[in-house]
Amino acid sequence: MTAVSPTSSSIHVALGLTDPEYNRICELLDREPNHLELAMYAVMWSEHCSYKSSRRHLARLPTEAPCVLVGPGENAGVVDVGDGIAVALRIESHNHPSAIEPYQGAATGVGGILRDIFTMGARPIALADPLRVGPLDEPRSNWIAEGIVSGISGYGNSVGVPTIVGEFVSCETYRDNPLVNVAALGIMPTERLVLGRATEVGSLAVLMGASTGRDGIGGVSVLASAGFDEGVDDAAKRPSVQVGDPFEEKRLIEACLEMLDAGLVSGIQDLGGAGLTCAASETASRGGTGMEVDVTAVPLRQVGMVPFEIMTSESQERMLAIVSPGNVDQVRAICEAWEVTATVVGRVTGDGMLRVRDGADGEVLAEIPAATLHDDAPTYDRPMRPPADMAARRDVDPATGSGDVSPGECAGDLLAMLADPLWVYRQYDHQLFCNTVVGPGHDATLLRLRDPRSGTPTGRGLAVSVDGNHRWCDADPGRGTAMVVIESAMNLACVGADPLALVNCLNFGNPTHPEVMWQLSETIDGMTEACDALGIPVVGGNVSLYNETNGINIAPTPVVCMIGIHPELVRRPVPDSLRAGTELVLLAAPEVAPGNIRGPQAPSAQPVPLGGSRWAWERRHCRDGALPVIDLPGAVATARFVAAAVRDKLVQFAHDVSDGGIGLAIAEMCCRGGAGVQARIPPLGASAPAVRTLFAEPPGRVLAAVEPGDVERLARVASSVGVECRRLGRFGGSRVQIGRRGEPGYDIDLALADTVARWRGALPQSFAGPIDGAAA
């Protein structure tokens, strides 16, 4: 290989760097960078790797708690769940690659998140996939959706990790910018925790896994740190999408865990965004050391690759292990047994420099202080302002003119919103390891928590929920995000679990737009307030910006993955069916208290707003309107009470009220439980029309199926903790009948069989055909 000549300052623009950033690089180096050095800075200072637009805002999130072993900044968050057991959790986005190449974009998102988990020393036990695509009646959106689902199932099923929970949302805001967020969980003994650090000078850097190719070069800057515009062909960006091999990943998982169990590795890092540049600089910077990398030692799958390509390739299924010289032979032996390639490509130095060499002692091709790549990326305080029309939008009432909606129209609106997402999750194997107690399709998933040393059940459960709501956050990013966090906690409560920690994926548009930065800042404040109210930390996350096409940004879409613990898992907290005669009750705080998040309490006679509701967006095509006020203390008290009531068997079946309001939630309970219902709902405000009572989405409400003999006791216990218990009706019969208290007749009166048919068939019928590679 030949030396790289110094660059002219114009090349930095093509690599995604600004003029001030280029000047800062020259200051840090006290010279001009050469081509290779400039490329390394470009990928590490990209939005995807550096969080340069969001870092100062993310610092406001609560990240500390007694359970936190590892918080943000490492490959994954790690929390102590007791008994010497730790859970690693992480969420990432693969939005831009999935818009270009849906199958590989989604598949490699799965592979990347799994490496983040076992890098910490944890065995991956579960995946979660909150997905968002454009309208399914449009061919391109349908093609993207099929490719994404196929990619996740093809990789996850093959690598042997179950996909246990997720979301599937179709909306026009994601027409050109689908969101593929993927979360993963792993379990390990607390003593096996390993960090991505190179602390011991003289240790060797061992590259393990797949060979290095040209796939994914520049992915963090070409795709993840820029939007899409007309005139840019997808094919031009397709080489920046990585290609995955789940069978290579499976072998890599087993090899890495075996060497970690044997104590042969002092630090380990996956090669994700920015490839070897990121892995080498991050491990060195975190460890306060330096590293020399020999690019001629890197196994290549394509001929003629140059140092720039080798150092920035994002080829999948690769890990960089920090190994003392005396342990290298044992590491190689383990890798050979698992048919994993292992090659020494560098060594740890004590001078803090990252050097790229042509040969172990050959010419220096790049010489950069490692910390400047990892720690010295710029941090921007970008301008922020709310949209100019925000105040006017909040004054709109989507229900205007809906006072005389007929029962037939109410029923039609409900059926149009009714769709069981379980069809998507049946493409995935969610029963691997036989740990799944409550599977996908319910409010949360519940897993048996096993001792990672012996594999024996602990008698406790690990609950997982994923939630996001772009409609709420478009109406009010701060309050909407707080509602999302509370909904996630409510979902855990519905399976009897108390929240422990969360990770977030913040999906937004172009950060150079002040309105987008305002949305992001408000989102972080809302998440902070809700987490503080729940008493839980944020232990990691991801920020995906530049989700825009032709200057049009997606609706702000923060997504959370929350975990909780069920302390005594002695029964399955979700029945297979609802028994006729079971009572339907509503559990919630008595009313929204004054002085809580984002605004004063409206008088009780005022109608609950319909802004941000699914009914307003999908049935009235109205994105305007105010959100309901959220009573954080009341919602937290309700979640805690519901979790305890489920565990104590006072509640047989619980379901939170969120998308689609209480009308849709009741219909979903009927469909899942196979029972009709006769229910009367208290009006939400004086003279509230049917659509407001049925479809408004005030947070902090849970529906519960209760045995008749337990209702009075449930009400007494609820009252003692400030939660109201309202009897709404009774399950049974062959019709779904929902009306307003004090009003004659029913606003919704549907045959149960027709309702179930719509619920089960809506999503499969939206796809053009069977999904390739779907699980049987």
Question: Whereabouts are the PLM-identified features?
Answer:
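Mobile "lid/hinge" segments at catalytic clefts and subdomain interfaces of large enzymes
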Residues: E74-V340, T349-M353, R357, Y380, ...
